Amino acid sequence: MDETALRALIQRIIKEELDPDRIPIGVSNHHIHLTEADFNTLFPNQKMTVLKPLKQPKEFASKQTVDIVGPKGTIKHVRVLGPCRAHSQVEIARSEALNIGVPAPIRLSGHLDGAPSVKLVTPDGEVTVQGVIIAKRHIHMSNEDAKRFGVKLGDTVSVEVQSQDRRTIYNDVICRPREDFVLEMHIDTDEANAANVDGNTFGKIVKA
């Protein structure tokens, strides 16, 4: 690479690094949210134990895992996220839903009406949960971020995911502003693999 090309590359990288409108892409692996009652059934005499904090405030991956049992198969050792919620919810990718024979709909978190059921199993207990979904892609953002992007809660935007060799535009991305949210777009593992997303991938809103 000659000096002119190298200088242009460095300038482009610096510009991208300083761009306030770029959005970190977070890849959401399959996971489970549990009510306190369901947690106690699956893990009697245990407390939910923090494995590592997540990017959004007060949320964490716990040390506890469960097996998801569907009509055609099982997904083993699926991480429980904390803290406990008002409703238990299972989030898996489309490919996983097909593998275990569950017709999971694409929904935002918490929108569980009509979602199918699966059995959750640990060595100490089992529960049947109605609430298996494929998470609809969305962007967590602060209220200040929302003002900067010119969006409000529930707005739909398109985001160009700026991954190497596979730049991809994702439509139908839901904006989810809240005062304490940290800016991050969430996609599932199927979407991430299709777009060659790694742990240092960013996106940018291209249409609002």
Curated annotation (Swiss-Prot):
Give its localization.
Bacterial microcompartment
Where along this sequence does the record place binding of CoA? 27-29, 72, 79, 193
- This protein is called Phosphate propanoyltransferase
Q: Would you kindly state one Gene Ontology biological process term found in this protein's UniProt entry? A: propanediol catabolic process
According to its UniProt record, which cofactors does this protein need? Answer: Zn(2+)
UniProt source species? Levilactobacillus brevis (strain ATCC 367 / BCRC 12310 / CIP 105137 / JCM 1170 / LMG 11437 / NCIMB 947 / NCTC 947)
Q: Which PANTHER family match?
A: PHOSPHATE PROPANOYLTRANSFERASE
First-tier enzyme category under EC: transferase
The residues that hold Zn(2+) 2 are 138, 140, 186
Q: In which pathway does it act?
A: Polyol metabolism; 1,2-propanediol degradation
Q: Which reactions fall under this protein's catalytic activity?
A: propanoyl-CoA + phosphate = propanoyl phosphate + CoA
* Assigned GO CC terms: bacterial microcompartment
> What is the similarity comment for this entry?
Belongs to the PduL family.
UniProt KW keywords: Acyltransferase, Bacterial microcompartment, Metal-binding, Transferase, Zinc
According to the UniProt entry, the coiled-coil residues are: none
Q: What is its EC number?
A: 2.3.1.222
GO molecular function: any one?
A: metal ion binding
Q: What is known of its domains?
A: Formed by 2 beta-barrels, each is capped on both ends by short alpha-helices.
